[in-house]
């Protein structure tokens, strides 16, 4: 999700993507729950602080083909004396390299565009393109998301395209449990990165547990490494795959095997 740390509440969807897409006919429903224990405490550019805020995002992803899916996000925020508030929505189509190409790594590309209310993000309309590369090797897993982001309305428009790399490596401790480390950065414009103190640098030790082929679970505790980053947060992702749509199978007309006619 596109984030510009000086002017918006982030932490709505904290995830390093793998290259796989949702299979055709399946719908993935995920709940992202992120609580900031120690974050920003003052209003900046009209944006509410995120300290002690619970950000919850519903992500619905539909698989259409073996290489194409579409995701839709509904962002919400809950804070002391504020109650639940709608933050905004994003849409995210994604394509991937089919398995039949036999590439040595998984590769996909997503693009995401959407709106967030001004009290949650001074940059209300944003866009992102995210290349995704991953690899499973025995018990080890690695994923890299070198995302490029752009604001279309708000104070970050003059910055142009910014660079936000995400990275994850994990090790399968058991057949069900893997432990890993996730990194999330927002480094500034591609034409010249911000000073380190103004960059967003967050490191999240995380756990993934396999409850079954239709489930997804991720939990992590994030620590900010710079003053422009929330200092302490907890994130959790719970996902479930459903079959709401049955893919149409083309009919194959068999040749007439009868030997006679009139």
What residue ranges belong to the model's regions?
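N-terminal signal peptide c-region/cleavage motif recognized by signal peptidases
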Residues: 3-5
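Transmembrane beta-barrel domains of Gram-negative outer membranes and organellar outer membranes
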Residues: 7-262
């Amino acid at each position: 999700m596109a984030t510009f740390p000086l002017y918006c509440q982030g932490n709505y969807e904290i995830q390093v993507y793998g290259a796989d897409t949702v299979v055709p006919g399946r719908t993935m429903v995920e709940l992202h729950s992120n609580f900031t224990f120690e974050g920003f405490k003052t209003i900046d550019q009209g944006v509410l602080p995120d300290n002690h805020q619970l950000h919850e995002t519903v992500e619905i992803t539909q698989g259409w083909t073996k290489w194409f899916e579409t995701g839709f996000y509904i962002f919400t925020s809950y804070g002391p004396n504020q109650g639940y508030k709608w933050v905004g929505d994003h849409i995210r189509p994604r394509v991937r390299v089919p398995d039949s190409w036999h590439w040595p790594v998984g590769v996909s590309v997503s693009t995401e565009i959407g709106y967030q209310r001004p009290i949650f993000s001074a940059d209300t309309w944003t866009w992102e393109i995210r290349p995704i590369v991953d690899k499973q090797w025995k018990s080890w897993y690695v994923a890299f998301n070198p995302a490029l982001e752009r604001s279309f309305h708000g104070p970050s428009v003059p910055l142009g395209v910014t660079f936000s790399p995400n990275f994850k490596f994990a090790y399968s401790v058991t057949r069900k449990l893997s432990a890993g480390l996730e990194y999330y950065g927002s480094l500034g414009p591609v034409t010249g990165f911000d000073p380190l103190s103004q960059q967003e640098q967050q490191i999240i030790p995380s756990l993934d547990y396999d409850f079954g082929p239709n489930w997804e679970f991720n939990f992590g505790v994030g620590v900010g490494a710079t003053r422009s980053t929330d200092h302490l947060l907890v994130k959790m992702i719970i996902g479930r795959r459903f079959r709401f749509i049955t893919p149409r199978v083309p009919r194959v007309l068999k040749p007439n095997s009868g030997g006679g006619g009139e």
